[in-house]
């Protein structure tokens, strides 16, 4: 390949590459633990209400969890008649086509007695159930009770399809009658008995396609709540939630809202019950009802009454400690932690309190125990920070990330990096910062060589579908770019994650090495210019910093606010010096453009000033958008030193390729 055609071939290659995606507005950005280290260590993230509820209550032995048949928590916009359609579909199971048609006809009647007459050909359980359903729909609750009881009185082998249905409907009927009957207490008790029977029938294997066994928990909870038993209602809804019903979750949220509205005296009495205490605690540590950082109106009342009712409590002590810590009651948090045991949350709080007390050794030990105690898969879900960054909170990863802050302060830089890197993508921004700014290139390379093998390259289809790179590939790319920046050209190539990047890195490195070894000035100039062109065209991919100042992690499309790193309680002088030593040169956004311009200037240094190549190199470099100052300096250099050329009228915009071959001849002529 001729030297003068080299960038043209590269241009052809670049035009064949897919264009990067253009975003109309900025994306959400993940939280960075290292952005404000003191705040990170001081704050205890709010819990997740769904996760907190999963810790409460007891599942019913033998009762199956709900399936997709009745549970789709993501379907927020389901059809209003979806429940009726599901019932109609389930009602057809086990029936012949003629029986299905007849049941549909009977459902449309308004006289339950006519159901018995016209449905005489149906099995007794089907006929009795439809008759009871018609009676219920028309408001004849007493007649409905009679039909459902008749069905349940049949021998077990004669009612395999409708036993669970009948018991569940019987419970609903008695609940409706509780507002009509003279003895409300008796009606509610019979309703509760029926729902318990429905649950047991489901456990015993009677047909339950609508999963009424789980639904009965919520219905029974409603009965219990109507009888004034908040504690019992909460326990039933908790069980329903544990069996996978979204109704259990939403009902507990509603109960919590109702509790918050109660007068203080009534709420204080209810808070003597464990289940009420636990529900209120779960809500408070999860900050339910908060909006954009604004505290709900009843929050302080709930906190005060809960603290008054749980002093010295052994139950739920770690959550009570968390609630106290979030409220700024650190003495109260310490008191609860005395009885909080050795769970992950308890040790996390002890670590934070040790940081507050200035005991970093105790904090480090507590963080270590917290990381060991939290399950690997514990997930508190998605949250927003006060500055609207997002965090997918996995406590084990978060604890290790906070521990990394203390490791950095102690000078244990590799340990800090590993703790952040283990979070996978969650705290990648922090891991990347340590990898390219705090670790030496030798430390980083050794870790990658020993622990981060190259993952399989993404297929073209995966790239077309914007499948993100594995974090391992991102780390290896980061190392490859850093090696190129620091002059380790031959070593860098293998770390890039695909052949295209490897080829670009190889071309850049070859031209830099060629420039270093060339003894003839124009050959050196040609190689420097080609390296400069490569740096300008592909610098983000092969030279860019993952984080500041280039933000290769965003393809350079966005940048994040940064603050100058200064020595402080959590930042050592040694770390500051390491970060200064590894900062971009110059420390400007798209720093590789400045690298390209500097290489082009060096190319011009090796060319006869009267040559076309000298003018063309400066002209091209002036169009590389490094800065207005550099553009002006390049033009001024051309004015002072370069030859007159016609295309100088559009300097920096319309520039020919440098004619290095003729420059070589001119150089020989000038020398001789």
Question: What are these model-predicted stretches?
Answer:
Residues 2-10:
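Bacterial N-terminal signal peptides that target proteins for export
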Residues 10-20:
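Bacterial N-terminal signal peptides
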Residues 23-150, 155, 159-169, 182-357, ...:
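Extracytoplasmic/secretory-pathway proteins
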């Amino acid at each position: 390949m001729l030297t003068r055609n080299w960038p043209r071939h590269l241009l052809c290659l670049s035009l064949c590459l897919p264009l990067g995606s253009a975003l109309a507005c900025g994306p959400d950005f993940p939280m960075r633990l290292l952005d404000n280290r003191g705040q990170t260590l001081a704050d205890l993230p709010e819990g997740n209400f769904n996760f907190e509820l999963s810790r409460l209550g007891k599942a019913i032995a033998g009762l199956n969890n709900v399936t997709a048949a009745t549970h789709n928590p993501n379907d927020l916009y389901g059809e209003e008649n979806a429940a009726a359609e599901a019932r109609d579909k389930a009602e057809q199971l086990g029936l012949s086509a003629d029986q299905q048609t007849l049941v549909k006809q009977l459902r449309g009647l308004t006289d339950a007695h006519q159901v018995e007459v016209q449905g005489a050909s149906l099995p007794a359980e089907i006929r009795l159930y439809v008759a009871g359903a018609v009676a219920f729909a028309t408001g004849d609750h007493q007649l409905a009770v009679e039909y459902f009881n008749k069905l349940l009185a049949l021998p077990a082998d004669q009612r395999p399809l409708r036993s669970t249905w009948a018991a569940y409907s019987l419970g609903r009927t008695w609940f409706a009658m509780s507002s009509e009957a003279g003895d409300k207490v008796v009606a509610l008790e019979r309703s509760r008995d029926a729902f318990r029977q429905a649950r047991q029938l489901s456990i015993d294997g009677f047909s339950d396609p609508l999963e009424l066994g789980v639904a009965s928990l919520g219905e029974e909870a409603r009965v219990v709540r109507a009888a004034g038993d908040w504690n019992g209602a909460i326990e039933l809804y908790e069980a329903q939630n544990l069996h996978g019903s979204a109704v259990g979750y939403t009902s507990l949220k509603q109960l919590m809202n109702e509790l918050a509205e109660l007068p203080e005296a009534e709420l204080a009495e209810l808070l003597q019950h464990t289940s009420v205490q636990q529900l209120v605690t779960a809500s408070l540590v999860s900050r339910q009802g908060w909006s954009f950082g604004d505290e709900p109106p009843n929050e302080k009342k709930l906190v005060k009454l809960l603290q008054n009712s749980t002093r010295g409590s052994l139950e739920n002590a770690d959550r009570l400690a968390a609630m106290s810590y979030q409220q700024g009651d650190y003495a109260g948090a310490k008191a609860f932690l005395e009885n909080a045991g050795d769970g992950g949350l308890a040790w996390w709080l002890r670590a934070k309190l040790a940081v507050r007390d200035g005991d970093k050794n105790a904090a480090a030990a507590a963080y270590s125990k917290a990381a060991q105690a939290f399950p690997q898969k514990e997930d508190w879900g998605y949250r927003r920070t006060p500055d609207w960054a997002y965090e997918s909170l996995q406590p084990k990863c978060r604890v290790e990330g906070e521990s990394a802050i203390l490791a950095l302060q102690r000078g244990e830089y590799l340990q800090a990096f590993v703790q952040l890197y283990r979070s996978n993508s969650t705290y990648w921004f922090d891991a990347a910062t340590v990898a390219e700014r705090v670790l030496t290139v030798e430390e980083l390379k050794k870790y990658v060589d020993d622990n981060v093998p190259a993952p399989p390259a993404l297929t073209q289809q995966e790239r077309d579908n914007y499948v993100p790179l594995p974090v391992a590939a991102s780390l290896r790319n980061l190392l490859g770019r850093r090696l190129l920046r620091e002059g380790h050209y031959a070593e860098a190539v293998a770390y890039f994650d695909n052949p295209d990047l490897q080829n670009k890195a190889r071309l850049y490195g070859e031209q830099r090495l060629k420039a270093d070894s060339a003894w003839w000035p124009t050959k050196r100039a040609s190689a420097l210019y080609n390296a400069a062109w490569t740096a300008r065209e592909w610098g983000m991919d092969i030279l860019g910093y993952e984080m500041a100042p280039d933000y290769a992690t965003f393809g350079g499309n966005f940048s994040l606010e940064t603050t100058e790193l200064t020595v402080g309680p959590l930042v050592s002088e040694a770390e500051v010096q390491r970060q200064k030593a590894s900062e971009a040169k110059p420390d400007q956004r798209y720093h590789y453009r400045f690298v390209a311009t500097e290489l082009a200037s060096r190319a011009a240094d090796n060319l006869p000033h009267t040559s076309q190549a000298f003018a063309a190199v400066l002209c091209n470099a002036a169009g590389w958008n490094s800065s207005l100052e550099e553009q002006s300096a390049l033009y001024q250099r051309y004015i002072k030193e370069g030859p007159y050329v016609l295309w100088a009228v559009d300097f920096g915009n319309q520039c020919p390729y440098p004619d290095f071959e003729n420059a070589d001849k001119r150089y020989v002529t000038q020398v001789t």
